[in-house]
């Protein structure tokens, strides 16, 4: 249960009980009332701004109104004390019995604790990675892959119907270049000396194997075909090979998409999907024939000093109108974006989330304009931009040459440090802030390495369970037994740990609402820190050890507390896509 939602309802009920009314009549607007943890834990367990947001409507001084509300809240059987602070904040401290009951709820819910129905009935498409199928994934793709994947997992846990999607850019000019590059490697595999790879083609050695496979399958037959026919075959085989490589790279990172959507699908049957999308916009009055003035600075590739078919995107929030069709009748790349969004909308998605690199910042307004025009403002579109990742080794920048083939791949990073450190650390900054990734730092065993610190907390929980088996003979811990004596958990440090656990449902919902999966990584680190602190208190004070052989009931209660810590760590790490280890190796 979300205790903050619980007390939000209690506080609003209290406002009704004291017959709080607007001075001008009517009903009070309670929508701005906030109920959250105090910024300073010493101030209490629950804080609300109710008096400050209602004082003007009620016509009463905020502190005086706060005192009136506070007095009424003291009647709540779960409230230990109520204080008014600052300009009119109300801080509530709850009784230990309340936290003990809440801990039992958490224990009974297990790893489902924190699961929400926030997104019930809402269908969301999360598109992420969508790297061009022209080679292996490099480290630059890594952050967007993790942010998108964890956000999708988070939304699912919060009750949304989520589809993870990858858009395969397999219809552009770069694919023609790729096919010609592989054709060269095919000829090389047949024994021809190809010399240096010509400028403009892809030089990477990863294409050698594709050429060899073509030579093994076709022999010299491709050389005997008309070039266009041979290149069409090479293109299909190469895209399949590149996507197999990309899928393998993503699998190594524990990233799995539900849908791989081919751009070429939009171009089949004389680009029917694109034509239909443009026709729909035309019927809505969003398309016209005209000429665009030359933009300042570098000219975009879709600008022409001729009449074109244009999207009236400035009327739906964009900076300039956008070309859909060139003067020669060919479609712009942007026209494909319109058709792709329409396809998503027609599949029934209420919300579309695009996770893109920071270099795609210029796409945001045009995509938002497409969403408004295609859906008549009914669909929500969000673009999350991921800033660059800078690689370091022992504090020194890792140099990457731009020369042929000399770049660090996603697989290089995962193979060196492991999947879990990569996923966790890619979340340890908000997506729109640059991130430093130090190969040495993410593998060290210290508090300064967040992923180690969190996973070590999980392993320590299971260490306590093994001690219970050795010292108390409790091989199979029973949740009913562990929850039968929570009234024995009275030490302030134990209650503080329960408070931290109780924040989890609110954290899940707020991270989902704001689409900020990094909040989960921060919370898990804080929870791990609280648990490690409690472990250390037991090392210093025998009375606070999790297992007291001479007090089995207290031991069971503390084991129940440890079990809930383990459950929440497991739940959070699962959403992140990392393991919750039972021991550190």
From Swiss-Prot:
Extent of motif 'HIGH' region: 131-141
GO biological process: one example: arginyl-tRNA aminoacylation
Major localization listed first in the record, in broad terms: cytoplasm
An annotated GO cellular component: cytoplasm
Major enzyme class: ligase
Catalytic activity line of the entry: tRNA(Arg) + L-arginine + ATP = L-arginyl-tRNA(Arg) + AMP + diphosphate
An example Gene Ontology molecular-function term: ATP binding
The protein's Enzyme Commission number: 6.1.1.19
Cellular compartment(s): Cytoplasm
PROSITE patterns for this protein: AA_TRNA_LIGASE_I
Top-level lineage group: Bacteria
SMART domains reported in the protein's UniProt record: Arg_tRNA_synt_N, DALR_1
Pfam families for this protein: Arg_tRNA_synt_N (PF03485), DALR_1 (PF05746), tRNA-synt_1d (PF00750)
NCBIfam families xref list: argS (TIGR00456)
PANTHER family: ARGININE--TRNA LIGASE, CYTOPLASMIC (PTHR11956:SF5), ARGINYL-TRNA SYNTHETASE (PTHR11956)
UniProt similarity note: Belongs to the class-I aminoacyl-tRNA synthetase family.
HAMAP family for the chain: Arg_tRNA_synth
Subunit structure: Monomer.
Name the record gives this protein: Arginine--tRNA ligase
Organism: Brucella melitensis biotype 2 (strain ATCC 23457)
Organism ancestry: Bacteria, Pseudomonadati, Pseudomonadota, Alphaproteobacteria, Hyphomicrobiales
